[in-house]
Amino acid sequence: LEKSSHQVKVKVMDASEIYDPEFRKLAHEKKPTAIIPVGSIEQHGAHLPITTDSDIVTEIASRLAKKCKFIVFPTISYGISFEHSPLVNISIQSRNLRGFLGDIVEQLYHSCEIIFLNGHHGNVESLNKMRKTMNRGYLEPYGLAPVRCYSYWHFMKHEFDHAGFVETSLMLAISDKVKMKKAKK
């Protein structure tokens, strides 16, 4: 906790600010929950940056970590965006994303419960396949907590749209990178 003169602020547990002895102590005393944002780099029109999906999911993960006392790990900014070719996107193959996320699970599952928070629709299938493989093969047979994967838009009341009202509104709330003069109605 950080104290100011009039209020107490709960600090986000950010993996980049946790050192080995502290992490080991946390893992030993209370198996913490790790939240790992997964985004993408792709076009979002002329008004939003190509990092929009990663920016949004990083902010949501940080807020969840603060509220729920999770440890937020660095965002995986590369995802599966081949559907946007030939427009700007930096995509990785599904098998590579699954393998990369699976490697993370193999390293963390003894120390943490794991939640992947997704910020890009193209990642959903790979995240679900990885989750099923890891849970069936590594975690459930040993009574360990399953890997969980969620996409942030499943918790929204408004219908999701790519580079439209929802993503623009979220980016306006968290960033000064939006160029509203270039937005189309």
What would you call each of these model-derived segments?
Residues 2-185:
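Extended, histidine- and acidic-residue-enriched regions that form the cofactor-binding/catalytic faces
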